Amino acid sequence: GFIGELERFFALISEPKFHPSKELIDKLNYLSTLGHEPPLVAIVGQFSSGKSSFLNALLGSDILPTGVVPVTAKPTFIKYAPNYMLKILHNDGRDEYKNIDELSAFVDQRHALKDVKNLTIYAPNEILKKISFIDTPGLNSRSDADTYETKMILKEAVALIWISLIDNAARKSELDELNAIPNDLRQNAIALLNQKDKLSDEDIARVLTHANTTYSTHFSSVAAI
């Protein structure tokens, strides 16, 4: 079929005799997955904005641990598989697989995360058959390497959901991070202002008006949840 022919073509022009650049090889590898992988939606937001809780609610299952220590200290893919599983990609390219029950304990070990590039959580969730998610540590991480990794991953995403605490929405502290969102992703990006139950209806309307003005060049729509 077409996908098979495409993969054979990619394999051919990736051969050393064609002197392909690493950037080209990475792009070809990404394109070759498009026939198999569901589209990737990025979940982005500042620390403790409720990204993991939002994803759990969306998926109807507590797949991601929540609490003080964020699982998204590293980029975390959430993908479909028949069984729960955790894959750890180390900086040296080595894959390590663990039982999903070990996830919380693993992310509590900050020293262990230093050698990790990203995590993938596999789950037998029907939504994940159609959409994969990437829960990111944000674009203002203390680690330049983590920020770079997030930016590279965003290039693979087809849509983006920004999660912001409603009482902290559209403040200057967010704008530098928002400016790092790729321009071609902004038309498929939305902002969700989390924990609207903290505010009165009048305050929600005021915040939404301010956010729509501030976010106008970054998101196609803004909503309070």
Predicted regions and their residues:
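Globular "head" domains of long coiled-coil molecular machines
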Residues: 35-225
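Charged, amphipathic alpha-helical linker segments immediately N-terminal to NTP-binding catalytic cores
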Residues: 1-19
